[in-house]
Amino acid sequence: MRRLRDYSLCLCLLLLWPLAVNADDSWRQIQTEAHGQTVWFNAWGGDPTVNRYLAWVSEEVKRYYAIDLRIVPVADAADAVKRIQTEAQAGRRQGGSVDLLWINGENFRTLKQANLLLTGWAESLPNWRYVDLQKPVREDFSVATEGAESPWGSAQLTFIARRGQTPQPPTSPQALLAFARAHPGSVTYPRPPDFTGTALLEQLLIALTDQPAALRQPPQPATFAAVTAPLWRYLDALHPALWRAGKDFPASPARMDAMLNQGTLRLSLTFNPLHARQKAASGELPTDSYSFGFTAGTLGNVHFVTIPANARAVAGAKVVANFLLSPEAQLRKADAAVWGDPSVLDPQRLPDGQRQALAAALPQDLPPVLAEPHAA
């Protein structure tokens, strides 16, 4: 029996060996094609920390792969999406202006539905083998990615407070309402359509609605009012206790950080669980700043890069996406002194030294991750 098992194992290895060889050959061909290419990477440029990290990525892919990575800072990925749509309408099926795009779920759905994205490539990247498959890396805002996006960071809606000011933070919507009423004018959220402000509203809707399953599907006109009614009632109660009585809102989480630092606010918001640590280390937030979330869970997601179907430098874009998934790049990105963006890799899939380093860099004691509502 043992001899039969050994024979079966050898046969399986022999059958799989050509597949591994072909995959290696295919990737080497992609790297060869990428050599010397210019890759235009459209990415959110609203944080100097992120910009410095991407500048480092540009240096590394130049050094290792002879790729000229040009970062195109955008205020909103929707601007790049409109450009891709305009090129498609003009019949520009090749040689597009965007090779790689940092994209959110709503814009991903828009491009995917219009068949404007390259599909089926992400899980063929060599560094995909390190990805934590327990994270939502195969869907984006409840839309299946189908290999059209490669993950490169994870995020979770997180509150920030100061221990000297708020030793016991609110950890539920009801506690947040009571906290705001107890400290009028010291709580707020970024004005939608700011991503973080919108995420807080989605977080509250998930926690308050009595029809949570409906949020995993596109909104239905017949049920929308009933599904969302608890949120509107809650906001009607919350807004009078907010900063400026809920008649005005900060433009961004960065503005909330500044107001927390000044003592105007007691809470700030971020989508990065390591943000408080990173900003305290840089002196942009007080040293007693800490992160927390709702006990029942907070909204979480993965951020992705995608390749338009009409990209000029497809091979180069794949090589850059693969580098973004490398343990080296992910460890550097997770370092609070660099960016502090949580990794999408599974430490258990890494070699010993990198495994320990990544495990130490991951956020600790996070609340459960709640799936985002459907992108529609």
Predicted segments — roles?
Residues 19-23:
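Sec/Tat signal peptide C-region and signal peptidase I cleavage site
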Residues 243-308, 349-350:
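Extracytoplasmic/periplasmic substrate-binding proteins
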Residues 44-56, 72-79, 94, 98-254:
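Extracytoplasmic ligand-binding site segments that recognize negatively charged/polar headgroups
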Residues 27-35, 42, 47-68, 159:
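Short, polar/charged alpha-helical segment
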Residues 84-93:
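Short, well-structured alpha-helical segments in soluble
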Residues 1-9:
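Bacterial N-terminal signal peptides that target proteins for export
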Residues 298-299, 303-372:
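Mature extracytoplasmic/periplasmic domains
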